[in-house]
């Protein structure tokens, strides 16, 4: 019996040794939750901070931006001025020998007043203007329109064609040449310095670009970068002003020779 008791005690000892040992130190765990109100406040606080930072960045970027000038657009407009003046300069060189001399006349027809170009067209043949009348019923009306103008010309019906009027070209005199040159200079000044958008002068285009440029920056004094941009535009304006002057002088010499 003593042997059985010993075995029982040994088995109990082994069993006790195999049981897991639980530490006596306990760390309490607490579930942490953020209330909706606190979360909203934290989000709002962070949002305001980000918004402020973005605003500062945008202000810095605005300060660093250099006002821009559309050089392509300005160049195209300057070219348009040169082209329009060149056309008028060519007409001035022809003076009263230009076939367009009658184009602005108003003709009184049976259907009322109409423009010259709607009832006739003009060409130059030798030392004569040849006016072709579209409707024979308007021949007399066109003759009266020419006689009533300040052109000092006397159209005659061509015997070989009743719908054709022959008008001798006026002789070119020194006085008429000087007058043509004077009129051309007035046109030149209008295309160069004329005011008003309707005139489309180089000065008007420059003024529009300058005003738009100045509105893009709020500082009274231009920065170095801004100064460079505007100086480049001023060079472009001068370049086309010189071109306009060249066209004028060339046409003036052709008129006076």
Swiss-Prot record:
Which coarse location class describes where this protein primarily resides? mitochondrion
SUPFAM superfamilies recorded? Ribosome recycling factor, RRF (SSF55194)
Record-linked InterPro entries? Ribosome_recyc_fac (IPR002661), Ribosome_recyc_fac_dom (IPR023584), RRF_sf (IPR036191)
Keyword Transit peptide listed: yes
For biological process, the GO terms are: mitochondrial translation
Q: Which UniProt keywords apply?
A: Mitochondrion, Protein biosynthesis, Transit peptide
MF GO annotations: ribosomal large subunit binding
Where would you find this protein in the cell?
Answer: Mitochondrion
Cite the Pfam families for this sequence: RRF
* Gene Ontology CC entries for this record: mitochondrion
Q: Which family does it belong to?
A: Belongs to the RRF family.
**Functional note:** Necessary for protein synthesis in mitochondria. Functions as a ribosome recycling factor in mitochondria.
Which protein is depicted?
Ribosome-recycling factor, mitochondrial
- What is the species of this protein? Debaryomyces hansenii (strain ATCC 36239 / CBS 767 / BCRC 21394 / JCM 1990 / NBRC 0083 / IGC 2968)
């Amino acid at each position: 019996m003593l042997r059985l008791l010993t075995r029982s005690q040994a088995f109990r000892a082994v069993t006790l040794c195999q049981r897991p040992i639980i530490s006596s130190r306990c760390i309490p765990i607490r579930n942490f939750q953020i209330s909706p109100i606190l979360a909203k406040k934290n989000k709002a606080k962070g949002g305001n901070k980000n918004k402020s930072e973005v605003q500062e960045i945008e202000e810095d970027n605005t300060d660093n931006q250099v006002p821009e000038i559309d050089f392509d657009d300005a160049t195209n407009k300057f070219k348009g001025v040169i082209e329009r003046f060149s056309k008028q300069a060519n007409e001035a060189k022809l003076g009263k020998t230009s076939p367009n001399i009658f184009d602005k006349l108003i003709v009184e027809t049976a259907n009322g007043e109409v423009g010259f170009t709607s009832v006739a067209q003009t060409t130059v043949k030798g030392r004569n203007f040849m006016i072709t009348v579209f409707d024979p019923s308007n021949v007399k009306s066109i003759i009266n329109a020419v006689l009533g103008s300040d052109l000092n010309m006397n159209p005659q019906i061509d015997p070989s064609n009743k719908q054709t009027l022959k008008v001798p070209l006026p002789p070119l005199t020194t006085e008429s040449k000087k007058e043509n040159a004077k009129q051309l200079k007035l046109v030149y000044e209008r295309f160069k310095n004329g005011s008003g958008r309707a005139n489309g002068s180089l000065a008007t285009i420059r003024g529009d670009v300058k005003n738009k440029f100045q509105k893009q920056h709020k500082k009274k004094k231009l920065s170095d970068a801004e100064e460079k941009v505007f100086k480049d535009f001023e060079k472009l304006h001068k370049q086309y002003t010189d071109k306009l002057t060249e066209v004028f002088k060339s046409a003036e010499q052709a008129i006076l020779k």
